[in-house]
């Protein structure tokens, strides 16, 4: 089975901001079929585009960047994973942000490796 990666929002931001990023180099060595994105990451990136000047240009860049990759939705099955994981974390006194938990839920359901700006 081929490993598939879901890059977190901060990984894509690092990719866009740093032409010499390790993420950019690693993506050049793997098949686009090994990388997926999700609706949560897309929404965070689009929100970032709304916050700054050149909104239309930024949205176009994001859409072009993510076009080669499948985009998984956060759906009802993922919501059930989210609820279970959040409950388990709360019992342990651990809390992570809701968007990160949504991304983690998608990764758990689909057997994906989550990657942040620290590396792919």
PLM regions with names:
Residues 12-13, 42-45, 79, 120:
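A generic structural signal for short hydrophobic patches within well-formed alpha-helices
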Residues 42, 59-62, 79-82, 100:
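A general structural signal for well-ordered alpha-helical segments in protein cores
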Residues 1-37, 47-64:
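Short, well-structured N-terminal submotif of metal-dependent ribonuclease cores
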């Amino acid at each position: 089975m081929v490993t598939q990666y879901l890059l977190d929002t901060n990984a894509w931001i690092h990719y866009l901001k740093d032409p010499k990023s390790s993420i950019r180099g690693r993506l050049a060595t793997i098949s686009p079929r090994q990388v997926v994105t999700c609706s949560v990451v897309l929404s965070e990136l689009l929100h970032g585009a709304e916050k700054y000047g050149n909104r239309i240009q930024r949205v176009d860049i994001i859409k072009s960047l993510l076009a080669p990759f499948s985009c998984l939705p956060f759906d009802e099955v993922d919501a059930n994973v989210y609820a279970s994981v959040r409950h388990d974390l709360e019992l342990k006194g651990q809390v992570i942000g809701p968007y990160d938990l949504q991304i983690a839920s998608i990764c758990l359901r689909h057997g994906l490796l989550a990657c942040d700006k620290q590396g792919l």
